[in-house]
Amino acid sequence: MKKCIGLGMAGLASLLWLAASSAYAKAGVDRVLLISIDGMHAIDLQNCINGIEGTPPFCPNLAALAQNGITYPNASTSRPSDSFPGLLSIVTGGSPFSADIFYDDSYDRSLAPPANPNNGINNGVPSPACVVGTPGPGTELKYDESLDTNWDPVSGVSTSINVPSPGIATTNLALDPMNGCSPVYPHNLMKVNTIFEVIKASGGHTAWSDKHPAYDLVNGPSGKGVDDLFTPEINSMVSAIPGVSVPGLFSCDTAVPDPDVADWTSSFKDIKCYDQYKVNAILSEIDGKTSAGQDIDTVPTLFGMNFQAVSVGQKLVQKVDVAATVTGGYQDAAGNPSPPLLGEIQFVDGAVGQMVTELKNRHLFDSTLIVITAKHGQAPINPALVNKPGDVVSPVLAAAGVNLVQVTEDDIALLWLENQSQTDTAVTTLQANAADIFLDTLYSGKSLLKLFQNPLTDPRTPDIIVKPTLGTIYTTSGKKIAEHGGFSADDTNVMVLAANPSIKGRAINAKVTTQQIAPSILSQLGLDPKSLQAVKIEHVPALPGLR
């Protein structure tokens, strides 16, 4: 004890680091490969590794991982189940209660609208709506492809999959009056830190790949959490991707299979090219290189990516010629995938197999924990339940004299009222028109406060959330047959699989959330889960079996 005191603060810090390193070594895990198969339900994993009603299984690589892995059939992602809060649940351990991010398209009453290209921060003049030192007047927060520096407002997509650095057009960002009317980058929205920041602070190397430059979000409040952030734009014009081929299917090197579609999400084939591009980045990182192939002789301590192929396979109705379409999704309530969806699931399984093979080739497999989950599910699974009435919520409220400053709709409706004193009127109106809006559950007042912050004091929390009946999507689009973002089990009951050769294969049926992944990753690396602010705020434990 006297020796410890005599070492002073620097020596004590060293001892603490050694203690952490000892726990790290004892766990036998040097790194974590984290994967989100967006849209992948728990039932999808069960079906693909076990087969459905006597049919053969169709995911040999996921099945092999499950042999030495823990599956969690009753895992739930965030509510709302949008990609932004869904990913933050995984990498912060927080729900929107602590992270305070509800959707990639939401609202903040304390911020000001973006500057415009001709009169904004690019030429040093603040937007007229932004007054330094005065909160508001409020603005939509839209963090998607429309932030890209090469986004084309006419086509609605970016002109290239590789968005030129720095990637995000500052004139499209909301402004913060309390910070000199400076632009609010996605990472500036963050109120809690991420596992990337904790691992980087402990000396680790970090990498992540996702679908928009707006996923700068994962950098956390510091803006520096991810050393190698690779974000090819998914909503960009399709084009050949040099060096990319989908094993056993087709090459994307000189041309894509469907060159005439709007973007990568509009083709069951092209989306495979897009995802394979990111898979190649992971393979490069396993080889001790950056996502771009630069040799750095370092394999990340935490790295990973999201897949979009399954999500596209669940949602898309693809027009293949003037008169014909191909429809994805499921064939029944049991989750039998349609042929297009089956192809996407098998592609992702094969891609996971590529990563496992490369880890083994580099003698890294035994010391790597592989965690596979999903930011969100997709609803409905049962195609008979699909109901697309369009926007029926806003007109009902408008007729009652209730104006909205923002409505965000998918298979959920998040409502921000212009006048928050009209909340009771809005609730009464919605309840009176329950059949017309296909209402299942309404969250406001006390029911909202059980999940989130108070919208009267928190500038981002919606005043009302409308959960519609299962299968209802507030759209009239003929291009999709499913959506996510909602609170239903189809939206939230996602796969979670944690695998390593040292793990005894089993299923743990306890109810868990994807929030528990973040503290689990840190504990497996010998780091303190309570280093995560959201974990402390919400008292989030590690996953059973990984504590």
Residue ranges, per PLM feature:
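Short, structured active-site-proximal loop/turn typified by the sulfatase FGly-forming signature C/S-X-P-X-R
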Residues: Q46-D100, H205-A207
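Acidic, His- and aromatic-enriched active-site or binding-groove loops in soluble protein domains
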Residues: T92-D105, A207, G223-I286, A324-I345, ...
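Beta-strand elements within well-structured catalytic alpha/beta cores of enzymes
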Residues: D30-A42, A64-A66, I90, I199, ...
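Short, solvent-exposed turn/loop segments enriched in Gly/Ser/Thr/Pro and often Arg
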Residues: T71-V91, S209-N219, Q308, Q533-V540
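Active-site His/acidic residue clusters
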Residues: P213, L217-G225, K289-F347, A384-V386
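Catalytic-site neighborhoods of secreted/periplasmic enzymes
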Residues: V132-T254, L532
